[in-house]
Regions:
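Q-loop/switch helix immediately C-terminal to the Walker
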Residues: 5, 9, 16, 22-59
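Conserved ABC ATPase signature
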Residues: 77-81, 85
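Hydrophobic anchor residue at the start of the ABC signature
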Residues: 91
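Conserved catalytic motifs of ABC-family nucleotide-binding domains
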Residues: 98
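Catalytic Walker B motif of ABC-type/P-loop ATPase nucleotide-binding domains
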Residues: 102-106
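Helix N-cap at the start of a conserved alpha-helix in ABC-type nucleotide-binding domains
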Residues: 113-115
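Conserved catalytic loops of ABC-family nucleotide-binding domains
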Residues: 122-135, 143
């Protein structure tokens, strides 16, 4: 893979949400603002598609609503969001880029159990829709991974199918979630 191919197929979701922009909508559009692939060719030559055209408010609103974020106003400053809201907005932004692989680095760290569960449900749905997800956590397994690996002191101490050890509630045929726990 070239670096460009890697970036187009793999997304990294950090533990602490980074939401740049004056509004939630601007923060979500950031990858589309930076994406070179958003240019289009017209009779006059290459033309840059505006981020708003590439990702209209309606699509952002629909995505947030489907993620249980109907209470988040697109014009709200991102720095006014709660920790759980910021995590879900960051996750929405990442999912809208439609990566094939998502590396989720402790995205539920610092969240209360309710918000951590919401994030886990969203990730499980993305896996069911065909995305491969690697989720790193310091929490106990939550039953959403199809495979679980555990590291302790730099050594792999557990690896296997989550259904076999009773930590998964179900698996998907198109995508998978690998949960890595660090002790």
């Amino acid at each position: 893979f070239t670096p460009q191919q890697w970036r187009a197929q793999v997304a990294y979701l950090p533990q602490k949400p980074v939401l740049l922009g004056e509004t939630v909508a601007q923060a979500i559009r950031l990858p589309f603002t930076l994406a070179i692939r958003q240019s289009a060719r017209t009779k006059q030559g290459p033309r840059r598609i505006s981020p708003t055209d590439a990702l209209p408010d309606g699509r952002i609103r629909e995505t947030l609503d489907n993620m249980g974020c109907a209470d988040i106003d697109l014009n709200r400053p991102p720095h006014d969001l709660s920790g759980g809201q910021a995590a879900r907005v960051s996750l929405a932004r990442t999912l809208l880029t439609r990566p094939k692989v998502l590396l989720a680095d402790e995205v539920d760290a610092g969240l209360d159990d309710d918000n951590a569960d919401k994030v886990a449900r969203i990730l499980a749905k993305a896996a069911a829709d065909g995305m491969a997800i690697v989720r790193i956590r310091h929490r106990p397994p939550d039953g959403r991974a199809t495979r679980v690996m555990r590291l302790a002191d730099g050594t792999l101490t557990q690896s296997g199918n989550a259904e076999a050890d009773g930590t998964a509630t179900g698996s998907t045929s198109t995508g998978s979630t690998v949960e890595g726990s660090v002790a």
